[in-house]
A protein has these predicted regions:
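Basic, low-complexity terminal or inter-domain segments flanking catalytic cores
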Residues: 2-5, 92, 175, 208, ...
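Phosphate-rich ligand and nucleic-acid binding surfaces
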Residues: 225, 255-256, 326
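Amphipathic alpha-helical transducer elements in NTP-driven molecular machines
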Residues: 11-18, 35-38, 42, 78-89, ...
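Metal- or metallocofactor-binding catalytic centers and their adjacent structured scaffolds
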Residues: 234-267, 273
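Conserved short loop/turn motifs at secondary-structure junctions
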Residues: 2-5, 103-106, 183-185, 256-265, ...
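C-terminal or mid-to-C-terminal helical accessory/interaction module adjacent to the motor/catalytic core
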Residues: 73, 95, 137-221, 256-260
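Intrinsically disordered, low-complexity regulatory segments
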Residues: 1-164, 168, 466
């Protein structure tokens, strides 16, 4: 009997696929049954080798060894993944396996994950590709009924390979180059660094901002209020107020406009991450993680998408889905919603995957068994679908201009004619615990041109507002639009990163200490600011990186040459190393941490500083050092804090509370004495119990 081997990206996906195709017998590292073997990767089972694997000299970071340009490229299997790789390799090479199905995630990265494993295993058997946008049983069955040759995705693989190689070349070489120059590990990345630069530029604008005071004059008559434009000085504003108080204001003009606001599009990953950050405070990574969990539970369609439309063959499916949601969701009770499904259907605007929507499986299960965060995300996606197929929001605006004492004042009002999709949106937002911006409607009284009023007047003081710090919501939007104004109209990819990678980029910036979260705000640290300032434009420009993304998209479509792209990347890396061969001595200390002075050295009188593991004398010729993990303090289960160290240096002794006694098993308070013998180690002793 021969088998078809199916390789998924992770165990949970393999389990779902196996259940649908009848591979129900659990084996070591795979499922078997119905003529199928179903195994899995654990993310990237195979990766590019580290630089040190090409040559031992690369284990140390030296300028003279740069640039590092692998030829040929080598691959490794990480130690923690070797067991599963060996299982997959043995399955690929089993004599009774006559064909292979690539069932990794349907996208650029998923293609790369499978191809690396397939090549590393030395397999040459024919491969078909499973391409699905949902983990529902019906979608998996349909996918297996429409498997395509994996060669159809060769261009996608070349795009993924170019992306991975470019990231390695720029990341390894630029990180080593600037780390060596500045004597500190400075992580540089193709997308990460321009993103940091955007944060630094915004921070600089905020710091440079100088608020300016201005004034407005308001006139009032009953419920009517109209305002002047901005007035620069208080004297002029008060003069206008005095003239208008008790005077007559005449309605000079009234302009009425009927307007229509179409529903917003369905969610792609970026818009879902932005809205979840705005409404729930989720980070981009949290939203992606929750969406991935819901996808694997078959409740949500594939989340790593950049499309906000559905394919035209999904019309009937969406009709049924909407009807079911209207019955299921509390916010939909009593809604009169004739669905306009055609608005969300456009096959031309769907590339790898359609927009994110709930599945029919979710309609059956509902919110039962979901965590609170998953419930929030599902509610958000459901309400978006209902909004997207609802009627437009129709309203009328009224702009009335008044003349009073030779000055012009304006009043604006808005009246809703047809609530449309906004009724659903407002119902959803009313269920949220978080504060949301509610639209305040200002209805003007009935007015006629030439109508006259006796008015009172007042002066209001205002200040101009600084630019706002980025939140994950606004930064994701800026990343998505980066470079768009400088690129051709028909450029398909105009941004930093992809929907699937942006969350990880933000997390890495935070982990590396270049960015910190302050509430919802993302703010660059001192090191982040310095790094963005010292790096060249070729690494920090969002426009150049957006051009890369567009080229990668063109490669995936077969419209650009991958070899040309890689040649340009290698040339850029060579030029970078050549240009930055040295820096001035004063700049070499730019990233050195400001040392905290603890006290004076009892041996030489120089300053003693706090290090990561010790308190050390700043005089290199002096050997005085107090180790934080000194056995004296560890035996007594007491942290050797800067406060204790400072007291010992100043007074030769420190009062310490909560010392542990091994003899009694209890704690006690005592005075610890510094007993410096002048040798390599410093001693301590307890003077007396108190």
């Amino acid at each position: 009997m021969s088998f078809q081997l199916v390789i998924a990206e992770k165990p949970s996906v393999a389990r779902s696929i196996a259940a649908v195709i009848g591979a129900t017998e659990k084996q070591n590292g795979y499922w078997q049954g119905g003529g199928y073997l179903v195994s899995w990767c654990i993310g990237h089972l195979v990766s590019f080798a580290e630089a040190g694997q090409y040559d031992e000299k690369y284990c140390k970071w030296k300028y003279e060894d740069l640039p590092i340009l692998p030829q040929p490229w080598q691959f490794i299997v990480p130690d923690e993944k070797k067991q599963q790789f060996e299982i997959v390799r043995s399955l690929l090479n089993r004599p009774d396996v006559d064909s292979v199905t690539a069932a990794t995630d349907a996208g650029r990265e998923g293609e790369l994950i499978f191809r690396f494993v397939y090549q590393m295993a030395g397999c040459t058997k024919p491969v078909k590709r499973l391409w699905v946008s949902s983990m529902e049983d019906a979608a998996i069955r349909e996918g297996f009924a429409n498997l395509r040759p994996d060669s159809d995705y060769d261009a996608l693989y070349q795009s993924a390979l170019c992306r991975a190689k470019a990231d390695w070349l720029v990341g390894i070489n630029a990180t080593r180059l600037f780390s060596v120059l500045y004597h500190k590990t400075l992580t540089v990345g193709r997308v990460q660094t321009p993103t940091l630069k955007m944060l630094v530029d915004r921070d600089a604008k905020i710091l440079r901002f100088q608020k300016e005071k201005y004034y407005t004059v308001g006139i009032h008559s009953g419920s009517l209020k109209a305002d002047s434009g901005r007035i620069a000085d208080a004297e002029t504003a008060n003069s206008i107020k005095e003239k208008c108080t008790g005077a007559n204001a005449v309605c000079a003009s009234i302009r009425r406009e009927k307007k229509t606001e179409q529903p917003h599009k369905l969610y792609d990953l970026t818009t879902l991450q932005r809205e979840a950050n705005r409404l729930f405070g989720f980070t981009a990574k949290q939203t992606l993680d929750y969406a991935q969990q819901l996808y694997e539970k078959k409740l949500l369609t594939y989340p790593r998408t950049d499309s906000q439309y559905l394919t035209e063959d999904m019309g009937q499916t969406v009709q049924h889905l909407v009807s079911d949601l209207l019955r299921l969701l509390p916010i939909a009770q009593g809604l009169d919603l004739p669905p306009k499904v055609g608005r969300v259907l456009n096959s031309k605007k769907v590339s790898d995957h359609h927009a994110i929507i709930p599945t029919s499986e979710f309609v059956k299960q509902g919110f039962t068994g979901l965590a609170e965060s998953e419930c929030k995300l599902m509610s958000l996606v459901c309400s978006k679908l209902l909004c997207a197929i609802a009627a437009p929001h129709e309203y009328e605006t009224v702009t009335a201009v008044f003349s009073c004492a030779g000055n012009e004042f304006t009043a604006k009002g808005k009246t809703v004619l047809v609530p449309g999709w906004k009724e659903i949106d407002q119902r959803f937002r009313s269920t949220l615990k978080a504060d949301t911006e509610e639209e305040v409607l200002n209805t003007l009284p009935e007015l006629a041109e030439g109508q006259s009023f006796s008015v009172t007047a007042n002066v209001s003081e205002h200040f101009t507002s600084p630019p706002k710090a980025y939140t994950e919501d606004t930064l994701l939007s800026a990343m998505e639009r980066a470079g768009a104004e400088d690129m051709p109209e028909d450029a398909e990819r105009k941004g930093l990163g992809t929907p699937a990678t942006r969350a990880a980029i933000l997390e890495k910036l935070v982990q590396m200490g270049f960015v910190q979260r302050k509430g919802k705000q993302l703010v660059p640290t001192k090191d982040g600011i310095n790094l963005a300032v010292v790096l060249p434009e070729s690494l920090t420009s969002p426009v150049l990186t957006a051009e890369w993304e567009n080229r990668l998209t063109e490669i995936a479509k077969g419209n650009a040459d991958p070899d040309e792209f890689m040649a340009e990347i290698e040339a850029q890396v060579r030029q970078l190393v050549k240009t930055y061969s040295c820096i001035s001595a004063d700049k070499q200390n730019l990233f050195q941490s400001e040392r905290v002075i603890i006290g004076k050295c009892p041996r030489c009188g120089e300053n003693v500083y706090e290090g990561k593991k010790n308190f050390y004398c700043g005089n290199r010729g002096c050997q005085f050092v107090m180790w934080k993990n000194d056995r004296f303090f560890e035996q007594r289960k007491k942290a050797f804090t800067p406060k204790i160290a400072a007291a010992l240096l100043k007074n030769g002794k420190a009062k310490v509370k909560g010392l542990y006694s091994e003899k009694t098993g209890k704690t006690y308070d005592a005075t610890v004495l510094l007993a410096d013998t002048g040798g390599k180690y410093v001693n301590y002793r307890v003077e007396r119990k108190e």
